[in-house]
């Protein structure tokens, strides 16, 4: 629910940004963009924070949208959120332990000689599987 609300707010902010008057500036008024950059730099300075907020023009204010960090992680992996949740659920199922009886063989199709010579990784060393 929270992700969908954040996505809607983010999309709305992008949609409104496309239709602001600042996007339709004629080429003759490009010098004003440098003036707006200076205004933005002055807003970020600490000296402006001490002044009265009424002194800042209302037309130069911008909305900054911060997304949830979990959403960005999912975007970097390239998988949609619903597929990641399904994969995580599948991973939990894959990590379940299977118990075997002691008298069960590994496989009836493997001969006893071959089974005894098979090697299993124990730590950093390969040892015969029957020693494990």
Swiss-Prot record:
Its protein name is Pro-MCH 1
Q: Which terms in the Gene Ontology molecular function aspect does this entry carry? A: melanin-concentrating hormone activity; type 1 melanin-concentrating hormone receptor binding
Q: Which cysteines are joined by disulfide bonds?
A: 120-129
Cellular component terms per the entry's GO annotation: synapse
What UniProt keywords apply to this chain's record, in alphabetical order? Answer: Cleavage on pair of basic residues, Disulfide bond, Hormone, Neuropeptide, Signal
Its BP terms in the Gene Ontology are: chemical synaptic transmission; neuropeptide signaling pathway
Q: Does the keyword Iron apply?
A: no
Q: Please report which protein family the annotation says this sequence is part of.
A: Belongs to the MCH family.
Q: Does the keyword Plastid apply?
A: no
Q: In which tissues is it expressed?
A: Pituitary gland. Produced in neurons of lateral basal hypothalamus which project both to the brain and to the neural lobe of the pituitary gland from where MCH is released.
Q: What's its job?
A: Plays a role in skin pigmentation by antagonizing the action of melanotropin alpha. Induces melanin concentration within the melanophores. May participate in the control of the hypothalamo-pituitary adrenal gland axis by inhibiting the release of ACTH.
Entry-linked PANTHER family: MELANIN-CONCENTRATING HORMONE, PRO-MCH
Leader sequence residues? 1-24
């Amino acid at each position: 629910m929270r992700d969908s609300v954040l996505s809607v707010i983010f999309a709305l902010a992008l949609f409104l940004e496309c239709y602001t008057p600042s996007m339709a500036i004629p080429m003759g008024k490009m010098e004003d963009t440098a003036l707006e950059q200076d205004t933005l730099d002055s807003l970020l300075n600490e000296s402006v924070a001490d002044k009265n907020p009424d002194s800042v023009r209302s037309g130069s204010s911008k909305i900054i949208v911060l997304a949830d960090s979990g959403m960005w992680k999912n975007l970097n992996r390239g998988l949609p959120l619903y597929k990641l949740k399904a994969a995580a659920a599948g991973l939990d199922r894959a990590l379940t332990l299977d118990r075997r009886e002691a008298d069960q063989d590994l496989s009836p199709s493997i001969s006893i000689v071959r089974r005894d010579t098979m090697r299993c990784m124990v730590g950093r060393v390969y040892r015969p599987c029957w020693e494990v």
